[in-house]
């Protein structure tokens, strides 16, 4: 091969061989979805909520809604005379150790049936009763409350962009207003 060809190959062709690798490595797409939450939540519900079964037991789970950011997924469960709402968190979380590191991971929070109804109604009530306050100044007027080890922050960011942020167990996830309303509607439908 001539020196010209080798030089041409190095300058023009070789970078194109690495181009797909650069594209893949720069992808910021989250790899979590409602389907994965459903898959992972099954064993969480069995081991942490329903408990062991020597013979066999049946249970139902329904993935209610996932926020577009995939940070929070809501799942209804019913089995062994227990029912409720599981919130799945997926995002970066902070571990305060000697290095103070950030990791990507997931975790689930169980909210028993009565408490779930209480929580969903409280959020809806705050949004309805404080609409004027929340709409007055985007991203400036905020409402917060604590519920079962979680901190809820409600605010607006732009027209028709209600936000609900939940901080729990080193996760900080956003539950979009649309996903919240879908969760509430489908949760109420699932219990009938």
Across the structure, where does each feature detected by a protein language model lie?
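Bacterial Sec-dependent N-terminal signal peptides
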Residues: 1-31
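Positively charged, low-complexity terminal tracts
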Residues: 25-192
């Amino acid at each position: 091969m001539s020196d010209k060809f080798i030089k041409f190959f190095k300058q023009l062709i070789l970078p194109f061989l690495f181009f797909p690798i650069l594209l893949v490595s720069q992808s910021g797409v989250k790899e979590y979805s409602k389907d994965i939450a459903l898959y992972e939540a099954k064993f969480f519900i069995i081991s942490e909520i329903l408990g062991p079964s020597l013979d066999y037991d049946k249970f139902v789970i329904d993935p209610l809604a996932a926020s577009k950011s995939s940070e929070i997924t809501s799942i209804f469960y019913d089995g062994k005379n227990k029912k409720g709402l599981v919130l799945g968190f997926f995002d970066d979380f902070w571990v305060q150790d000697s290095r103070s590191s950030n990791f990507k991971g997931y975790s689930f929070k169980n909210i028993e049936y009565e408490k779930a109804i209480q929580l969903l109604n409280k959020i809806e009530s705050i949004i309805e009763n404080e609409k004027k306050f929340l709409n007055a100044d985007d991203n400036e007027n905020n409402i917060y409350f604590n519920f079962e080890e979680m901190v809820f922050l409600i605010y607006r960011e732009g027209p028709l962009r209600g936000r609900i942020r939940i901080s729990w167990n080193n996760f900080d996830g956003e539950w979009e207003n649309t996903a919240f309303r879908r969760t509430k509607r489908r949760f109420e439908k699932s219990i009938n």
